[in-house]
Structures are given as C-alpha cells and as structure tokens.
Amino acid sequence: MAALLLSVTACAGPASQMETKPGTVVDHLEVIGADGTLLARTEVPRQTGWCLYWNHSVTGDGVIDCYVDDLGKMVLHRAYQPDFAAGLGHYPGRGILTSAEGGGYWIEDIDEPVRGNAYVLRVGSLAVNHRIVTDSDEINLSKMAEHTRVTIRLDTGE
C-alpha cells in the first residue's frame, strides 16, 4: 500500500511552463469501450497525474505506468518495473533508470507525450488486474472490461 501511495503522489511531474496554477483547471480521464460507450470518468486537475497498475501476465509481478496532465497534454512521466521480464525494460534515451527502494526499477523522467491524448489498452484478466489510480479515485478496468479493448483518454473539454 505504501508503494501505491508513493507512486500516485510521485507521478505528478512539473509542467514545462507554469501557465496554470496547479489544481485550478480540471480535466477528465475517460475510459471508453470499443463500442464508444463511456465506461468511467474521473477528474484530473492539471499538473497532477494518475497511474495504471497491473500484474505482469507472465511473472505476476506488479508494473506501474504513471502519467501527468501537463497543461492539458497526457504525458507518460515514469514507470515501475519489478524486473526486465517479457516486454519490459529500459531503452537508452527514454528516461533515467533508477533502482527502486525494495527492489525493481523506476524509469524516471520519461516525459513522453501521448499522441492525441489517448491510447488503446487490451484489458487483462482479473489476475492481471488493470486499474487506474488517481489521488481521489480507483477504476478497476479488469472488473469492468476484462479481455476487451478500451481507450484511455484525457478530455480537456477543448
């Protein structure tokens, strides 16, 4: 649980410019089903973030990707990986690899914008347990959309 709290509060990264006082503009993170149905929606104040948690489908170990609402742009800020199992790893030039307290690795300062403020995810089984965690909410994707395709989108109202 401490790792969960640490990673959620730590996923908020600095904006490249301070055009907006943190928390004064609120965007929404949406989960949209393959048929276009809105499955979930939660508030995300600008300059704050959220994390996508799941258990690796091969090893079962926890993996985390943390995003930031950087002035209305979805940005992948950091990622936690317990090891370099199938599909995991660090690529030179994409963030800074650091050892995590208690084991595993953080890839810090990835700061990679997500094209179109959205990405598609094939939600895993209940064992994979895909979930989005914000400072005030938790959306369990595996419970609502197991084995289906969803789009995770930052809605800025623009």
Regions found by a protein language model. Give the residues of each.
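N-terminal secretory signal peptides
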Residues: 25-82
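Sec-dependent N-terminal signal peptides
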Residues: 1-4
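Mature, soluble, non-transmembrane domains
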Residues: 50, 74-77, 88-158
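Charge-biased, low-complexity intrinsically disordered regions
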Residues: 15-26
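A generic structural signal for ordered alpha-helices
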Residues: 41, 45, 83, 110, ...
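Short, surface-exposed beta-strand/loop "edge" segments at domain boundaries and coil↔beta transitions
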Residues: 36-41, 60-62, 84-86, 113-117, ...
